[in-house]
């Protein structure tokens, strides 16, 4: 498909997808115009003076909307360690309230991922984070194309769940000691097109 997109007589290429695919399309487009809507890996930073309830609400809407399948959704949470326990407890409590099921049911908050393969990829990413030392505080289970809203603690900035975009309902928490450390962690992802 990529060959047909790049090699055709179209005047402009427009693609939505992963950063890797976007880089490939851009590198082969020659002098043709390219518009790319690529994945993101957006942090939500919660500093010690934050309104914790508002921050939790930001995660609930940003990490779990459309089962976490939003390119500009919250993909990692960077929290000052002085408020991390309170923030994490509230986030876990709210996450446990999420009803997963048929999206046609008005009470359902979390539906399926795009397909079972996507849910397996999220499951693998979370399992790898756990093997590397992360702890599942709630969620972490897959049933077909469903994947539970998941909160991960003990996450480090070098884990795949942080470095790469996890396209599912996962909220990895990274604790920091200072504002400077929080800011430095916002930049620790794979390179993207700017």
Name these PLM-found stretches.
Residues 144-147, 164-170, 188:
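Conserved glycine-rich beta-strand-loop-beta hairpin in the small C-terminal domain of fold type I
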Residues 128, 162-163:
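Conserved ANL (AMP-binding/adenylate-forming) active-site segment centered on the GW(Y/F)…HTG consensus within
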Residues 8-9, 13-22:
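Active-site phosphate-binding strand-loop segment of PLP-dependent enzymes
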Residues 20-156, 178-180, 184-185:
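ALDH superfamily catalytic-core signature
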Residues 1-7, 12, 187-194:
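Single conserved hydrophobic/aromatic residue that forms the stacking wall/gate
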Residues 174-176:
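Short acidic-hydrophobic, aromatic-tinged amphipathic segments that line or gate anion-handling sites
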